[in-house]
Amino acid sequence: MILNKFVNNKLKKIVNVYQLNYINGSSPGLGDFLRGSFCLNQIANLLGLEFEIDVSNHPMAKYLEHSTHIHGIDYNNLEIAFQNGNKDQNGSIDYEGRQTNINPNFINDIINWLNTKDCEVLGFFCSAFPSFFNHKPECKALINSKLQPNEFMRNYIDYTLSELGLTKKGYGIIHVRTGDNYLVNEDPIDIHFINKIKNIILNLISPDRRYLIISDSNVFKKHMKSVPQCYTLIRKIEHLGGERMKNDKSTGVMNTLLEYFLMSYSNAIFSMSVYFHISGFSKYCGILNDIPFKYIKIYK
């Protein structure tokens, strides 16, 4: 593999910045941001650059520890770059099961782009796919350090666990993505579709274990209340990406972040989705917290 030379002696650090809007578009979901962060960390290591993530300009920063702006970044003049880049060249939808996903053209494009930047610290948004899927502990520690709940959020997490009757690491997560149209557009969800997912779950769960249901559909969660082993949390949630967020001032951001943290304290994650791609929200939460993860495709 022949790569172009990185010759920008001025550039010292690249930062993946998660906020709602950029000069050329709006952000996708949190999972996309986490995926791109793993990708950029690998690029930074390859080129000998420092790497950092920054969520200080996103509404969820209100609920996180030590979320401060980074010197040298103009948050009003950031762009989206290489969004969803480095996808499998053969069009495979399950390539994350492999250990590598190396695309020299993608890496060279980034090198060429970075060579043009006249700054020491470069902030931008990237959701590209990593080249390697064996993620280093140092990278996981770095990302986790920026996603720590503050005192208010920790109290909210503890209160919620007590309300549910669950303890940290004492439950599994079943994360069900019925489709963003049910979360964002509040489309009515078909009862036959609900029962189809419910039957899959009934064949999945063990009678001696506890499961917390996380989903983009509160309607679906209500239908799972009748299953003894399943616990549900019915609260207003919000898509965290700027492209689909309806209200950045509502409690929805806080509650979606709550679901992320509850998932991070689980002992297993089952991710079910109508999409052909794996949910980054649950997948990367599992990776960051060393939680066993299994993906199940839902066919409508």
Functional labels for PLM-detected ranges:
Residues 1-33:
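N-terminal regions that are enriched for targeting/export leaders
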Residues 2-15, 62-208:
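Secretory-pathway luminal glycosyltransferase catalytic domains
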Residues 56-61, 128-130, 177-181, 216-220, ...:
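Short, solvent-exposed loop/turn segments at secondary-structure junctions
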